[in-house]
Amino acid sequence: MMPVRHQVLLRLLFACALPLLTAPGHAAAQFELEKVVELSRHGIRPPTPGNREAIDAATQRSWPQWTTHDGELTGHGYAAVVNKGREEGLRFRQLGLLTAGCPANGEIYVRASPLQRTRATAQALVDGAFPGCGVAIHHVSGDADPLFQTEKFAATQTDPAHQLAAVKEKAGDLALRRQALAPVIQLLKNAVCVPGKPCPAFDQPWQVEQSKSGKTSISGLSVMANMVETLRLGWSENLPLSQLAWGNITRSSQITALLPLLTENYDLSNDVFYTAQKRGSILLNAMLEGVKEGATPDVRWLLLVAHDTNIAMVRTLMDFSWQLPGYSRGNIPPGSSLVLERWRDTHSGKRYLRLYFQAQSLDDLRRLQIPDSQHPLLRQEWRQPGCQTTAVGTLCPYQAALTTLGRHIDPHSAPEVDMVLP
């Protein structure tokens, strides 16, 4: 028989070990990550040629040229996305989704918008997650993918009259909207205009306008949003301070203060429900179908790399918004992503969905900070009644989550698309 003092010691050891059995690591083992569908924005780029022309004209001065061609992923942007891809690869391996080393068949499929900045971002993500493995990046042969360039396909085009009416209805009194943002507009004017010289964009009223192609925008606001986006990208790129608003911006908090203009522009463009439903249903439908068991391609990680406009329309249909530290409501930073995860409870066999948006902070992007425990990716989760907080995040009952997230999909604007490209 065991001596009494040994029995007492054993009880003490068991009592000390008991908290370990209920620690998050043990709880996490209850849940198995089965599938990830991720929609990422491209990384840091200079202004597109069209944006540069517009902001030059609106401020009557030439904005700084970057070392990269306008609209293309920069070297700094590539490095920042590699950092994010490395963190995701590490996390997915720790959770058992991926195996060590290069991916085996059935682990990952990558589809990118055909533009250079999205293809290069996709390459950076897999170079980070699977260094040296040469993971294939798939994209259409032309310049229009039905998932991403939806304005170029009949089934997903908006009706100009309906779109104009929808934007006008949501915009309401634009003079009041402009007045509410007057302090932010003044900050932007102080940063980008030459004192005492014409700066046309800041003198005109905001008005709804529609191009011959049917694209609807808010004149005045849209070009201000382009300026703010260019400044945000420049900060994230680690441009010299002399090239950021001609030395007028020296802190990330100054960028943060300008971002409400981007939110306002999203609200009156891609976040307009009619626009999002016509042009975003096809992508949201593909994502929700892709997270299901037995979907094609039958891989553990389906990675889609596109544009902030795509993410904006999808999140509008999901009725999911966020506000990450240092960013305005609904902001979509370079390299950020919307992520769907399918989990299984190994005890009950029940399945769950987890949905979140993630990005790096303005300063972490600028200094190429590798995400770690001290500098984690910023994340905000989606939830609805019935979701539960677990050691692996907010998990929502599978079928109920699929139903809620897909309830605004317009079936007429969501024709089936082969995810696997020839």
Where are these regions (language model features)?
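Bacterial N-terminal signal peptides that target proteins for export
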Residues: 2-13
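Bacterial N-terminal signal peptides
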Residues: 11-21
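An exposure/low-complexity boundary signal
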Residues: 19, 23, 419-422
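Sec/Tat signal peptide C-region and signal peptidase I cleavage site
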Residues: 23-29
